[in-house]
Amino acid sequence: MKKIFINTVIIAALLVAADLMVGLVAKKLITNLPDSTILESDIVQSMQNKQADILILGSSKAKHSFVPQLFTDSLHLSAYNAGCDGHDVIYASLVLQSWLERCQPKIVVLGLWNSMLDGSWRANSVNDCKTLYDINQPYTQWVDTQEPLTTRIKMTSSIYRFNSSMVWLMKSYRNGDQHSDGYSPLFEVPKKMTDTPFEGFKPDEEEVAQLKHIITLCREKGIKLYMALAPDHEIDAAMRRWVADFCKSEGVWFRDYTFEKSVYPEITNFSDAGHLSDKGAQIFTRIFISDMRQQ
């Protein structure tokens, strides 16, 4: 029995030591992570490192719709697109909070979509950022105050947080600094395109709360906030109405470009039903900037 106890203690000590070592190595790698275009690297750069006068937030629709260089050329302000595939308003709020700890953008552009607001992407905001727990303060605070006890307990383990990160970390270091402005152009164009309707939109309470938090932060910091729905062949009428009513009630600048005639329905302006091609993004961004300047 004594031998079993001693072996158990030794194994536990080895596991603790291994966990500490994994944490030290992984944190060092993340702290010095090159500016790669890999999704996970994009998340780290957006949350930890990037600074610009104009911060663009949203999901993949925003990432493929807003061209930072056009903002810079027109407004003479630096711009970064922090849009992230499959991520919701909670993630957008965490990015903004993280930026405000190191800089203050002059303008925030928030591209919206139904999956950012209906709860279907909520888990991604926690799971895809877990390597930043105990590194990024807004994310750590979110987990510690909003997530279930089981999640908080798991987050104390470095092995849990970093168990699937080494592959993308190595890829990022292999790719090296690419000095990305966040925009991800799409050049493939479909042969045909039809509208895809969505029904049954219901806003998620916590995501709406974080959308309001973004508005509050921008007002408190004197940041100009612009919200928009980009041109789209994925049509959610209920979501469009809800966002328009919400922005009106909150007194927020909002434009619905879903059927923007300069972009929709021309097939070469789209890469698929839900994302603009680079050609479409260039056209749309110019229209958006023009509308911004008329405020």
Where do the protein language model's features map onto the residues?
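Loop/turn elements at helix/coil->beta-strand transitions in domains of secreted/extracellular proteins
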Residues: Q51-A52, L77-S78, Q104-I107, R219-L225, ...
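Hydrophobic membrane-insertion alpha-helices, especially the h-region
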Residues: K3-L24
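Alpha-helical transmembrane signal-anchor/signal-peptide segments
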Residues: V25-Q45
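Secreted/periplasmic serine-hydrolase-like ester/acetyl group-modifying domain
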Residues: S125-I223
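Residue-level recognition of beta-strand->loop/alpha-helix junctions
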Residues: G83, L229, D256-T258
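Membrane-embedded segments
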Residues: L57, K61-D144
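C-terminal regions of proteins
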Residues: R241-W242, F246-Q295
